[in-house]
A protein has these predicted regions:
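General small-molecule cofactor/ligand-binding pocket signal
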Residues: 125, 179-181, 393
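Mobile "lid/hinge" segments at catalytic clefts and subdomain interfaces of large enzymes
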Residues: 275-344
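Non-catalytic terminal extensions of PLP-dependent enzymes
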Residues: 1-123, 147, 248, 303-304, ...
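Active-site lining segments that contact anionic ligands and/or coordinate catalytic metals
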Residues: 121, 154, 201-202, 229-233, ...
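Conserved PLP-enzyme active-site core in the AAT-like
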Residues: 103-106, 133-299, 375-376, 403
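Conserved phosphate/anionic-ligand binding catalytic regions in large, soluble enzymes, centered on
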Residues: 59-80, 127-135, 266-281, 310-313, ...
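Cysteine-centered functional microenvironments
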Residues: 93-96, 128, 208
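A short, small-residue-rich loop immediately preceding and capping a beta-strand
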Residues: 122-128, 156-159
Length: 466
């Protein structure tokens, strides 16, 4: 397939613009480009065909099973999109006078109230644009709290090895030294390792519960108690909130602040269908540092994004919450856990889970022994799934499991879909022993086979050039 730039023909147009009825204004020379931008020139039909062809080469939740672990690729109800497309929401200007955006304000306030009830927090902001941005905002709350108290010796953030992947980077970006602690044999936080690193130099702990191997840490109250006794705060990464929403609240576990991925847990499209929203909630004592709730003094800057963040994502999330209601929210979490355990047990006769115990919303397969026996890697299995209409699971993560495949089926998949997926895994397991080369060269039917990822990382080509 050609790039859109390669289809460009000079002078070809697809836009019909009305005649200009205002006077021309000449921009100052210093504000003008020196040369025209390199934009493709196509007719409308060519443009339509190009993007139609592109969509036929991608795989989304609307196309088939998408068990991308730790990403919660659930189906996004169409009604959410319809609500976000209402003119009063889609056409609003962020600088409109307050009386003209009362409905938008009500959306933000109502969603904030519901999310505080679900998470056990007291304050909420929707400014962060995505999950990692929410993490960044949450850790800055912790930093500002300690700084405001003159407690500048707290320079470390504890991050377990089963935490979400962006946590160490977030802590480092906020200026903290990252202290990694290992998991115990059961996949949960090693309490003795935690106790060994706690001290008056610890600012806080970043934790996901359930963690990235899909296990709910039963020692969570003890973990947060230990951190608080050492003077630190506890940050909850909401990446896996889908497993427990409406059932248990992070605030009741002892967490002081949290970010949620509205674009995951609350069914607003992501993974190319975005944008996202990394809502951040906190306990009352941190509210003065929350971007939208603080009263700004002259020259002070307490924003992490312009206006109210990605507002239409909040509209979609509210539509989702209202559709499910108080009874439907915990039911969705229960079905997510049920589906994950069902699929894990169906697959277990072939590929083995890294932790042979009841999981939450996701589980991790460990293919290290399988690779030794067959020469087929986790990557080969993932690529082979593409030929069978299934999006690959998350590969080689978490790092504590060798040859890892992480699957999260979500609550919106039917039993029939899970049975079909389990059958595909069984077929691939047998194929690895009878024709491993077929798997090592997969995919065979995709538009792109196996790009050179090492070369792409070392010498990235990020834009088209003539």
């Amino acid at each position: 397939m050609k790039l859109i730039f390669e289809k460009s023909v000079p002078g070809r147009r697809c836009s019909i613009l009305p005649r200009c009825d205002v006077e021309e204004v000449q921009l100052p020379q210093e504000l003008r480009r020196q040369e025209a931008p390199a934009l493709p020139e196509l007719s409308e039909v060519d443009l339509s065909r190009h993007y139609t062809e592109l969509c036929q080469h991608v795989h989304g939740v609307n196309c088939g099973f998408y068990p991308l672990g730790s990403c919660t690729m659930k189906y996004n109800p169409r009604i959410d999109e319809e609500m976000a497309a209402l003119p009063g929401f889609a056409g609003v200007h962020p600088l409109a006078p307050e009386h003209a955006v009362a409905g938008c304000r009500e959306v933000l306030d109502t969603t904030s109230r519901y999310l505080c009830q679900i998470t056990g927090m007291d304050g909420m902001t929707f400014q962060p644009a995505a999950g990692a941005h929410g993490e960044f905002t949450g850790v800055l709350l912790i930093k500002q709290y300690h700084d405001a108290r003159g407690d500048h010796r707290r320079t470390k953030i504890i991050v377990p090895d089963s935490a979400h992947g962006t946590n160490p980077a977030t802590a480092a970006m906020c200026g903290y030294q990252v202290v990694n602690i290992p998991s115990a044999a059961d996949g949960c936080v090693d309490l003795e390792a935690l106790k060994a690193v706690l001290g008056d130099d610890v600012a806080g702990l970043m934790l996901t519960n359930p963690n990235t191997v899909g296990i709910f840490d039963e020692n969570i109250l003890e973990i947060t108690r230990l951190v608080h006794e050492a003077g630190g705060l506890c940050y909850y990464d909401g990446a896996n909130l889908n497993a427990v929403m409406g059932i248990v609240r992070p605030g009741d576990m002892g967490f002081d602040c949290i970010h949620m991925n509205l674009h995951k847990t609350f069914a607003t499209p992501h993974g190319g269908g975005g944008p996202g929203a990394g809502a951040v909630g906190c306990k009352a004592f941190l509210e003065p540092y929350l971007p939208q709730s603080a009263i700004l003094s002259e020259g002070e800057h307490l924003q992490v994004r312009a206006f109210n963040g990605n507002f239409l994502v909040v509209v979609k999330a509210l539509a989702y919450l209202l559709t499910l209601g108080r009874e439907g929210i915990p039911e969705a979490a229960e079905n997510a856990v049920l589906n994950a355990n069902y699929l894990m047990r169906r697959i277990q006769g072939t590929f083995q889970p890294a932790f042979d115990r009841i999981c939450m919303h996701e589980f991790v397969l460990g293919l290290e022994e399988f690779k030794k026996e067959t020469g087929v890697s986790a990557l080969d299995v993932a690529k082979s799934l593409i030929d069978r209409g299934i999006h690959p699971p998350t590969m080689y993560f978490p790092l504590i499991v060798h040859e890892a495949l992480m699957l999260e089926p979500t609550e919106t998949e039917s039993r029939e879909t899970l049975d079909q997926a389990a059958e595909v895994f069984r077929q691939l397991y047998e194929l690895a022993y009878t024709d491993p080369e077929a798997m090592r060269t997969a995919p065979h039917n995709a538009q792109i086979g196996r790009p050179d990822e090492v070369q792409a990382a070392r010498n990235p080509i990020l834009r088209w050039q003539a």
